[in-house]
Amino acid sequence: MNYTTVLNQVISIVNRAGNRLIAEWQRPDGPRGFYDKADVDTEIECELRPALLDLLACDFWGEETGSKLTGNQHCWVVDPNDGTADFLKGLKGSAISVGLLSQGRPVLGVVYAPVRAAGGPDCIAWAEGMKTIYRNGAQLASSLANASLTPEARVMVSSAASRKPAIN
């Protein structure tokens, strides 16, 4: 299977679902939900599930709608709003995360943050067979071994990082 071809289609599907997250963010009364559960999470996953399964019929594991695991070699893994609790607190940066596993091994991934504190949407994407990962359509360095942080660089960590410094 050519995962790079599938990747472009997944990016389109996830971008469309991102419009729902943007609309929820812009609601006059703020996003619907409480603590770490938001209505939009289930709505997005219900949009993603059939679109992804139409693209590649296989197993599915969703954070909101549950799983259907039959032993198929492929499995979609979806978190429709990674960062729901912060999203509901009014903090930008949550993301729609979609992965594809082949025999339990990641072969494709898309992380799309349509509402960010620093500018417009951000999409990180990768598929097996690609030489590097892509951010918003542009190649990123595949090795960070010789990279260094600049004063302008941003390092993203969980908002819970200060409560769990050992794992962050």
Where are these regions (language model features)?
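Acidic beta-strand-loop-alpha-helix segment within the catalytic core
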Residues: 99-168
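Solvent-exposed alpha-helices and their adjacent loops that cap or buttress functional pockets
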Residues: 69-70, 89, 147-150
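N-terminal subdomain of lithium-sensitive/metallo-dependent phosphomonoesterases centered on the IMPase/IPPase/PAP
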Residues: 1-81
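Glycine-rich active-site/cofactor-binding loop and its immediate structural neighborhood
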Residues: 76-115
